[in-house]
């Protein structure tokens, strides 16, 4: 332990310890290094940095072995437990190191043949995938949504490993995320699959994510749809039979299944439709018995989800629009990225919302820009996360058009872009 760490530890009496700290180690794709060697060098690095503040990443290393073999080392998700960035004494924590390499291939398309026509039934990724790298950190929520989902899946895996009798204690490994469009439900499902593949790499060699296109499962000839469902799940069964794989089945817009079921009951769709939906539910019931499968689902229309499906979900999590506090964090992450890329220049340190709370939102030369960002965040309330992440681009495209801008000019443009977004909404609703 170096002298700086000792001094810091003494100066901060409320250092957290006895935590479970996850360290994600991104190994380069061409690295031949063994996990044992990597773990040894990572522990040496962590021992030199005994006290850290919340989540932290290293991308440059003094150690030539790490420079040659590792992209990044990240202390991850501590703030999910501590809420705010806090000093953590790593020497008194249980440190779990997760080493992973990203699959660069992108998604494969799973097709089903119907009437001599190929239908895109699903997209299929090998995890961890480069497509989803960084996605987990980009998703910002007010409540403990991410922590709750991680804890749920890890508990489900524990119960399966310990052979808990599911007739006595019931769990299905089925998650339903519901809420308005644009709130990141599908992205959260993909990010969760990626994160869990990394977290559980000690027992599963890799992950598989199958994103089912719900609409493709319903043929225009309903009598054929049952065959499509069977074919789709036969392919999923092949993946599940590989015990070294952790398989995630993502059913997006699950209300499209239940809508067909209700329409059939009302007599507006053929009775074959209800058999198709029942076939899907039966297949879900069958694959959930396997310990290495997790079923993730999303819905934009909560009121249209059939009780037959919701009863199968262990967690029914509402994902709503972000609050001003979450919006502030989203904007702050965007600004930090633009500073890193030197589109916003010179780089300036902005205070976090927690910092502003500590000083009572007092305006001075240090807090002025952060307070301005806070005001922009407040007037952005009601916009979805999808829209919020577009606004920095629109601010630059519509009001700046310069290779480099100051933070002051950028905040001015961002404020105008927010106003423009609400005006567009108003104009659109008036013309409907």
UniProtKB/Swiss-Prot annotation:
This is Pachytene checkpoint protein 2 homolog. Gene3D superfamilies: P-loop containing nucleotide triphosphate hydrolases (3.40.50.300). SUPFAM superfamilies: P-loop containing nucleoside triphosphate hydrolases. It holds the Pfam family TRIP13_N. Belongs to the AAA ATPase family. PCH2 subfamily. The keyword ATP-binding applies. CDD domains: RecA-like_Pch2-like. PROSITE patterns: AAA. It comes from Xenopus tropicalis. Disulfide bonds: none annotated. ATP binds at residues 179-186. One of its GO terms (molecular function) is ATP binding. The gene is trip13.
């Amino acid at each position: 332990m170096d002298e700086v760490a000792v001094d810091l530890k003494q100066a901060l009496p409320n250092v957290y310890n006895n935590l479970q700290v996850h360290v994600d180690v991104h190994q380069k794709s061409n690295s031949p290094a063994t996990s044992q060697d990597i773990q040894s060098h990572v522990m040496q690095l962590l021992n030199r940095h005994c006290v850290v503040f919340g989540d932290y990443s290293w991308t440059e290393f003094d150690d030539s072995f790490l420079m040659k073999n590792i992209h990044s080392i990240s202390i991850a998700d501590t703030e999910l437990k501590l809420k705010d960035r806090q000093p953590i004494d790593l020497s008194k924590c249980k440190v779990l190191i997760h080493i992973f390499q990203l699959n660069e291939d992108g998604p494969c398309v799973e097709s089903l043949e119907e009437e001599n026509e190929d239908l895109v039934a699903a997209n299929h990724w090998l995890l961890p995938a480069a497509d989803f790298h960084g996605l987990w950190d980009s998703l910002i929520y007010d409540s403990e949504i991410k922590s709750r989902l991680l804890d749920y899946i890890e508990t489900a895996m524990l119960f399966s490993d310990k052979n808990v009798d599911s007739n006595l204690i019931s769990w299905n490994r089925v998650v339903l995320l519901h809420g308005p469009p644009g709130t990141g439900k599908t992205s959260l499902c993909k990010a969760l699959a990626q994160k869990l593949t990394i977290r559980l790499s000690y027992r599963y060699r890799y992950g598989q994510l199958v994103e089912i296109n719900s609409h493709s499962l319903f043929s225009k000839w309903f009598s054929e749809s049952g065959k499509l469902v069977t074919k789709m799940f036969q392919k999923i069964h092949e993946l599940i039979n590989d015990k070294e794989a952790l398989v995630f089945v993502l059913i997006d817009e699950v209300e499209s299944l239940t809508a067909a079921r209700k329409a059939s009951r009302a007599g507006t769709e053929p009775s074959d439709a209800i058999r198709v939906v029942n076939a899907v539910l039966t297949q879900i019931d069958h694959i959930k018995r396997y310990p290495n499968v997790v079923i993730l689902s999303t819905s934009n229309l909560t009121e249209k989800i059939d009780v037959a499906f919701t009863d199968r979900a262990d967690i029914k999590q509402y994902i709503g629009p972000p609050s001003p506090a979450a919006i502030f964090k989203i904007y702050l992450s965007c600004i930090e990225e633009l500073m890193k890329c030197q589109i916003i220049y010179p780089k300036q340190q902005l205070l976090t919302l927690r910092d502003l709370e500590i000083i009572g939102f007092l305006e001075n030369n240090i807090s002025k820009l952060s307070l301005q960002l806070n005001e922009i965040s407040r007037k952005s309330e009601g916009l979805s996360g999808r829209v919020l992440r577009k606004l920095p681009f629109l601010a630059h495209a519509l009001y700046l058009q310069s290779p480099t801008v100051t933070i002051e000019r950028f905040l001015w443009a961002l404020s105008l872009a927010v106003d423009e977004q609400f005006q567009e909404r108003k104009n659109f609703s008036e013309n409907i």
